[in-house]
Amino acid sequence: MNQEKLAKLQAQVRIGGKGTARRKKKVVHRTATADDKKLQSSLKKLAVNNIAGIEEVNMIKDDGTVIHFNNPKVQASLSANTFAITGHAEAKPITEMLPGILSQLGADSLTSLRKLAEQFPRQVLDSKAPKSEDIDEEDDDVPDLAENFDEASKNEAN
């Protein structure tokens, strides 16, 4: 960059005369508790009501993962059509949640579950497939076929 342009930019940032220091950029540090307080105050404006007795909340994403809340705090404002779920969230694959989550799945999730079920046996078979060395050993145990049984059955039918 040109020295003249650089000097102009430096002069714009300077506070006071030539001998004073440049101003420092103020950095605002936000904590999680401050965000929570701001969120709770916004929810109070919406007049949310606590909903008791909810043991778990599962949010199923398009990619097949589930956001799982165990014993969450659920608040709702029906007039604003807003629900707030707070608590410890865990991202889990849908296969880990399967036995208990089937009743919660919708039509879209069931079709994606079918696709996942089709892929699952292939993965299991690929992992359990015998190695080429094992195949050679197994071939020794099976006797060779001496005659063709299909031709013999055709001859009997005639």
Curated annotation (Swiss-Prot):
Residue stretches of biased makeup (Acidic residues): 134-150
Highest taxon listed in the record's lineage: Eukaryota
Pfam families according to UniProt: NAC
Record's protein name: Transcription factor BTF3 homolog 4
Stretches for region Disordered: 124-158
CDD domains per the UniProt record, alphabetical: NAC_BTF3
Gene: BTF3L4
Family statement: Belongs to the NAC-beta family.
Domain NAC-A/B: 33-98
